[in-house]
A protein has these predicted regions:
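Glycine- and acidic-residue-biased ligand/ion/polar-headgroup-sensing regions
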Residues: 37-50, 54-55
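Short acidic-glycine-tyrosine-enriched beta hairpin
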Residues: 55-73
């Protein structure tokens, strides 16, 4: 599925887990968001994303990983020309795109009731 600055492909799903391949286009910025029902583990496959995890920004490199706990505010940014590819493993009770609370989004998808 292609959604503006990113695309994703569901690779494998099991009971309470989902594996995706994420692609973040050059200069792409995803929503600043959190999830109530899942944690995520990201493995960087290509590129150098800047990850926001709560209030900290961290640059990651190929073959590095980062854990995003349930409830943590997070974002992926790609300030470079090369597409970022990430293997995302979601674990939790609800693994749907509806489990997203957005705080910032360049496409206007923040709902006032969500971000408070």
């Amino acid at each position: 599925m292609c959604i503006r600055d990113r695309s994703y492909t569901n690779l494998f799903k099991g009971k309470n887990f989902l594996v995706k391949e994420l692609k973040v286009k050059k200069r792409g910025v995803l929503s600043l968001q959190k999830h109530y029902h899942r944690s995520e583990h990201w493995l960087i496959v290509q590129g150098k994303p800047i990850i926001t995890l709560n209030k900290k920004k961290i640059m990651k490199y190929k073959n590095e990983s980062i854990f995003i706990p349930k409830g943590a505010i997070h974002r992926i940014e790609n300030p470079f020309k090369k597409t970022v590819k990430i293997l995302e493993i979601q674990k939790g009770s609800i693994l749907k795109e509806t489990d997203i609370v957005r705080y910032q989004d360049i496409y206007g998808r923040v709902k006032q009731s969500q971000a408070q």
